[in-house]
């Protein structure tokens, strides 16, 4: 710290003057001591302060020094204040005192001002505190692939959809129904870069898009033509049904019991949901090959989906394509499609009956369990082999197709207002009735013959009203013509 120079004037402040006198007096005595030792001389200091107090310093005995002083006739050098000031002015110091060894102890008005300014600055710094962290505002577009061991949570069906992010996040944060062991955030997933959700088994992770930034079709957004693709986010479907027109359309189905999870109390914690977009987006993490579909360039082309959760309402899942390289432990033939009417309720497949039911009733669960059979476990390896030599839609024109649809709902969709016929085959025991369980997961398979069959059909059931899914409204000839079905099936499989 450099020594400061002060103006040599009388200090007006009494306290400051007293402090300065004490420190400078000691400094003067210290200088006299140094001079007496260094130069072998006798020094006597006599000081009277403003209150007439006497302070003295003598290098030896004061009386001896004073006696010598009185005997001395003419001093060799005698100086006063005016002489010192004149000498300093000649040296160019302009009346300012040279820095002393103890000048930093000086408490002049100028030093007091500086000390007060330093105190104010330090108080300002201390009160301001450390610089805060930047605010944690995560308003970003994210894609959250979640490998969920449990089923997809079914939020309150009567609640309205505030925002897609809110619905997806509320579904993901419900730890009682969904506990994701692996959660990966991908910021701003570009449509051009294919992504894969993480996988731990034969079925991949559930794809949950909070802001619907998911590759779809030819690289377009799921909201490509102004309509929300409800199939892109299973959380939105599970929360409010198919929000197919971008409006708030809460489902009228009663919420499933047991926290809204269909058959949750009796399921294994190994269920997986794979809902990737179409061929140019994400593919399931199974051993699947890319499907080049003719419908892949449409913004609302239905994706390649393997849904194994019962809480997805069917109106948002109208399937038009299946992957071609699933595990071929079981293959589905056209003769097995006639037995699908037995699988019409999620309560039919309890976990105690899954294994035996898969082995002995394979024809009943082959297509429906892969598409909407939420009760099937991960290791069941049910698959669909849609190679060119097998045509799924090669059943007869109308009657077996009626039997193929689940027990009453799909028949009513085709016949508009006709009462449903009784199911031709006995059903496995149901733990809960259909009215308590809400929509059956098989009802999500709207027709399997067209990717848009469920769009213009009227649901005459009183307990559920299906919202309209955006699609191409087919006419009656397109529904009933087997050639049209085969042409569509050939367009699916490549």
Curated annotation (Swiss-Prot):
InterPro entries: HJURP_C, MEF2-like_N, TF_MADSbox, TF_MADSbox_sf. Residues 264-281 are annotated as: Required for interaction with MAPKs. The keyword ATP-binding does not apply. The record marks 174-175, 211-212, 453-454 as: Cleavage. There is a cross-link at residue 393 (Glycyl lysine isopeptide (Lys-Gly) (interchain with G-Cter in SUMO)). One of its GO terms (biological process) is cellular response to calcium ion. Residues 171-181, 440-453 have a biased composition (Low complexity). Residues 171-218, 238-268, 380-494 are annotated as: Disordered. Constitutive phosphorylation on Ser-398 promotes Lys-393 sumoylation thus preventing acetylation at this site. Dephosphorylation on Ser-398 by PPP3CA upon neuron depolarization promotes a switch from sumoylation to acetylation on residue Lys-393 leading to inhibition of dendrite claw differentiation. Phosphorylation on Thr-302 and Thr-309 are the main sites involved in p38 MAPK signaling and activate transcription. Phosphorylated on these sites by MAPK14/p38alpha and MAPK11/p38beta, but not by MAPK13/p38delta nor by MAPK12/p38gamma. Sumoylation on Lys-393 is enhanced by PIAS1 and represses transcriptional activity. Phosphorylation on Ser-398 is required for sumoylation. Has no effect on nuclear location nor on DNA binding. Sumoylated with SUMO1 and, to a lesser extent with SUMO2 and SUMO3. PIASx facilitates sumoylation in postsynaptic dendrites in the cerebellar cortex and promotes their morphogenesis. Residues 58-86 bind DNA. Transmembrane segments: none annotated. Residues 418-432 have a biased composition (Pro residues). Residues 454-464, 475-494 have a biased composition (Basic and acidic residues). The keyword Ubl conjugation applies. The modification Phosphoserine is found at residues 59, 98, 108, 233, 253, 345, 398, 440. Residues 3-57 form the MADS-box domain. It comes from the Eukaryota. Its main location: nucleus. This is Myocyte-specific enhancer factor 2A. It comes from Pongo abelii (Sumatran orangutan). The lineage of its organism: Eukaryota, Metazoa, Chordata, Craniata, Vertebrata.
């Amino acid at each position: 710290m450099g020594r400061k120079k002060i103006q040599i004037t009388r200090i007006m402040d009494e306290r400051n003057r007293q402090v300065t006198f004490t420190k400078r007096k000691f400094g003067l005595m210290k200088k006299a001591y140094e001079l007496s030792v260094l130069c072998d001389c006798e020094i006597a200091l006599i000081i009277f302060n403003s209150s007439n107090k006497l302070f003295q310093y003598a290098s030896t005995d004061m009386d001896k020094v004073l006696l010598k002083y009185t005997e001395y006739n003419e001093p060799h050098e005698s100086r006063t204040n005016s002489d010192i000031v004149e000498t300093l002015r000649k040296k160019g110091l302009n009346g300012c005192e040279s820095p002393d060894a103890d000048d930093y102890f000086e408490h002049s008005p100028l030093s007091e001002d500086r000390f007060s300014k330093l105190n104010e600055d330090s108080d300002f710094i201390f009160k301001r505190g450390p610089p805060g962290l930047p605010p944690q505002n995560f308003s970003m577009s994210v894609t959250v692939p979640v490998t969920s061991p449990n089923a997809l949570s079914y939020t309150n069906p009567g609640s309205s959809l505030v925002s897609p992010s809110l619905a997806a996040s509320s579904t993901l944060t419900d730890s009682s129904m969904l506990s994701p062991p692996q959660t990966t955030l991908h910021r701003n997933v570009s449509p051009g870069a294919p992504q894969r959700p993480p996988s731990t088994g034969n079925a991949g992770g559930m794809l949950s898009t909070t802001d619907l930034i998911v590759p779809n079709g030819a690289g377009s957004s799921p909201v490509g033509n102004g309509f929300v693709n409800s199939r892109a986010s299973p959380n939105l479907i599970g929360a409010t049904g198919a929000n197919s027109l971008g409006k708030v359309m809460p489902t009228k189905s009663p919420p499933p019991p047991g926290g809204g999870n269909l058959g949750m109390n009796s399921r294994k914690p190994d269920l997986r949901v794979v809902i990737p977009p179409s061929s140019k987006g994400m593919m399931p993490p199974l051993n699947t090959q890319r499907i080049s579909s003719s419908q892949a360039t449409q913004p609302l082309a239905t994706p390649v989906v393997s849904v194994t959760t019962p809480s997805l309402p069917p109106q948002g899942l109208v399937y038009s394509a299946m992957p071609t390289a699933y595990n071929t432990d079981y293959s589905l033939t056209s003769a097995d499609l006639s037995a699908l009417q037995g699988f019409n309720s999620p309560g039919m497949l309890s976990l105690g009956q899954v294994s035996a039911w898969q082995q002995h009733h394979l024809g009943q669960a082959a297509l429906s369990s892969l598409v909407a059979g939420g009760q099937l476990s991960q290791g069941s390896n049910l698959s669909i082999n849609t190679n060119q030599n097998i045509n799924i839609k090669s059943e007869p024109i109308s009657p077996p197709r009626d039997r193929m649809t689940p027990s009453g709902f799909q028949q009513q969709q085709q016949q508009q207002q006709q009462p449903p016929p009784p199911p031709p085959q006995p059903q496995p025991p149901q733990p809960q009735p259909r009215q308590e369980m809400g929509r059956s997961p098989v009802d999500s398979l709207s027709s399997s013959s067209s990717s848009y069959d469920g769009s213009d059909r009227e649901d005459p059931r009183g307990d559920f009203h299906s919202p309209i899914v955006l699609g191409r409204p087919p006419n009656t000839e397109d529904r009933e013509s087997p050639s049209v079905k085969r042409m569509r099936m050939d367009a699916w499989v490549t």
